[in-house]
Amino acid sequence: SGTAGEARQAFRQLSGQIHADIASALVNDSRYLREALNGRLRQAEGLASSSAIKADEGGAWAQLLGAWDHASGDANATGYQASTYGVLVGLDSAAADDWRLGVATGYTRTSLHGGYGSKADSDNYHLAAYGDKQFGALALRGGAGYTWHRIDTKRSVNYGMQSDRDTAKYSARTEQLFAEAGYSVQGEWLNLEPFVNLAYVNFENNGIAESGGAAALRGDKQHTD
């Protein structure tokens, strides 16, 4: 019935789903940092010539990022659309015994539009260390990254006589470790590199305290990994 439908909409608006959505999006976005670092290492090894990563002979490099993502809604939650753009820069050099070591930093911005007019923006500041070791055709790559987030959320709550515009500003962080092993198979007409990779990602915010109306939410620190 219409009453049941209105009740479902009210519960959805009260839930503060935008905070879970932005956390999910930032965890998913963590892959862009490690993909860039692994891509740079493959480039330095001579296994890839990525046009997205611009590098000089001294080991300095930069990559512009632009990505779009979405999550579909269902009977229990609304979906969202998100975009992330920014730049990563780094510097690496060859070391003794076929090692390569480097550091990287960068800035990205994530904008997310959720259900019922909710919106979240996050300014993301990245710092990472990475490296690889080659054993003939076998390459081992890995690194660690840390990202600081400054999150700004806005959401509307409208049902019955209730009409709120609730906002929040809070910080969060993402930590990640990643490793990859690849084996280069080079032939006269074909070059292949079968590989396997692993990643551990931990996200934690510093608590949420919305301001606005009676529907404003407060929450303690939350983390996911």
Give the ranges of each region predicted by the language model.
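Outer membrane beta-barrel transmembrane domains
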Residues: 175, 186, 195, 199-202, ...
